[in-house]
């Protein structure tokens, strides 16, 4: 299915699967296999500055809101995820709408809207409240380091070189 869109500044790590069901049949849209974001229809929509961690899967129809972290081996299927959400590793979110600023604990299976509505809110005390920002930052540093190497520079491992004598 198409279109599949990944927003600006998003991070798609190794082993991620983005897939969708058929979105056209005999030249006509298959509405049940599309999500609407901003008035446009998508098979899979990944917002801006989203992290899709190793081996996570987003299977359409699905939408993942801006600034969201989808953890390692997590699954989003036929679901809409709000902005600023953390889906911890191994969680499965199927057929629901997750409100903004919530987290899904590791290994959870969320298959009813009542479960989705009852998800805990992200607060300052939540240990992964800023996880997505950190993941985006470190991966941006990796990308910059790779570009520097490609241009003939020396690797700094993504970190600044220490001053001489230190």
Q: Where do the language-model regions lie?
A:
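Glycine-rich hexapeptide-repeat left-handed beta-helix
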Residues: 2-3, 8, 13-48, 54-56, ...
């Amino acid at each position: 299915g198409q279109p599949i869109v990944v927003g600006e500044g998003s991070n798609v790590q190794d082993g991620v699967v983005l897939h969708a069901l058929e979105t056209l049949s005999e030249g006509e849209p298959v509405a049940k296999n599309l999500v609407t974001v901003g008035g446009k229809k998508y098979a899979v929509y990944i917002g801006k500055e989203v992290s899709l961690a190793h081996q996570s899967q987003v299977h359409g129809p699905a939408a993942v809101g801006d600034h969201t972290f989808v953890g390692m081996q997590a699954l989003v299927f036929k679901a809409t995820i709000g902005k600023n959400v953390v889906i911890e590793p191994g969680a499965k979110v199927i057929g629901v709408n997750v409100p903004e600023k919530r987290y899904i604990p590791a290994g959870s299976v969320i298959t009813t809207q009542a479960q989705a509505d009852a998800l805990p809110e992200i607060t300052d005390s939540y240990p992964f409240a800023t996880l997505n920002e950190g993941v985006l930052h470190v991966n941006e540093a990796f990308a910059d380091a790779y570009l520097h190497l490609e241009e003939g520079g020396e690797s700094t491992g993504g970190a600044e070189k220490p001053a001489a004598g230190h």
